Amino acid sequence: ANTVKVTLIKSTNGRLANHKAXVK
């Protein structure tokens, strides 16, 4: 379960980073 959580968090952070880059 912990591994899945970490993966989810990483993918979410990646999405946020992509969103910020696109907004810039």
From Swiss-Prot:
Disulfide bonds: none annotated. The keyword Nucleus does not apply. Keywords: Ribonucleoprotein, Ribosomal protein. GO terms for cellular component: ribonucleoprotein complex; ribosome. Part of the 50S ribosomal subunit. Belongs to the universal ribosomal protein uL30 family. This is Large ribosomal subunit protein uL30. It comes from Ectopseudomonas mendocina (Pseudomonas mendocina). The gene is rpmD.
